Amino acid sequence: MRKAIIAGNWKMNKTVDEAVKVVEELKPLVKDATCDVVVCPTFVCLDAVKKATAGSNIKVAAQNMHFEESGAFTGEVAPGMLEAMGIEYVVLGHSERREYFNETDEAINKKVKAAFAHNITPIVCCGETLEQRESGVTNNFIACQIKVDIAGLTKEQAEKVVIAYEPIWAIGTGKTATKEQANETILAIRNVVVEMYGKEVADKVRIQYGGSVKPNTITEQMAMSDIDGALVGGASLKAEDFSGIVNY
């Protein structure tokens, strides 16, 4: 059985004080959670949030990182810096990074490998546009992403990857894929992992759904065969809302 993982991507929200306040409110609400609980604050909040989660069951993720160890990359953060802070996860290849910062699958693959080199678990995002969904090319498009994003890993690394399926048309729009659509696409993603690394590895890979996840939609999504969690956006900014999802 794969253990569910629910992560809250705060995006570019929350000052340090606000971030710590949310975590302090969240801790008692999710202390009995049966899934892995992860929060993804901005870089400036990582240290304070990491300290605030000490002794709790809440893990901390960065929202991005560079693939190089150090150097003249102004504004970037190296994987070793995150490792030194005790950061457990990193979100890579989010559609907003791909769209606004022109991130390529090749760069994402370098980041995935760098994350593993520094004992950080990557949460690798993939997903299609509405145009691609309506044209019937969703599975082909996502397969192309995944085949590059997680290429060249050992089987031990591959089985630890978390994949987040986020239909771009459902992010922040209030629209959400039906539980059947989400499960069908996630099953297709798992089959790509089977092709790449074999069934034994694919059966261990946790695949989340993301895209306007709310407390009132999570239960039916988590009941599906291949959905192993959620990457939550706006609904993770309030402790009460996020705990309602975590405690599905």
Swiss-Prot record:
PROSITE patterns: TIM_1 (PS00171), TIM_2 (PS51440). It catalyses: D-glyceraldehyde 3-phosphate = dihydroxyacetone phosphate. GO terms for molecular function: triose-phosphate isomerase activity. Substrate binds at N9, W10, K11, G172, S212, G233, G234. Belongs to the triosephosphate isomerase family. PANTHER family: TRIOSEPHOSPHATE ISOMERASE. This is Triosephosphate isomerase. It comes from Clostridium botulinum (strain Eklund 17B / Type B).
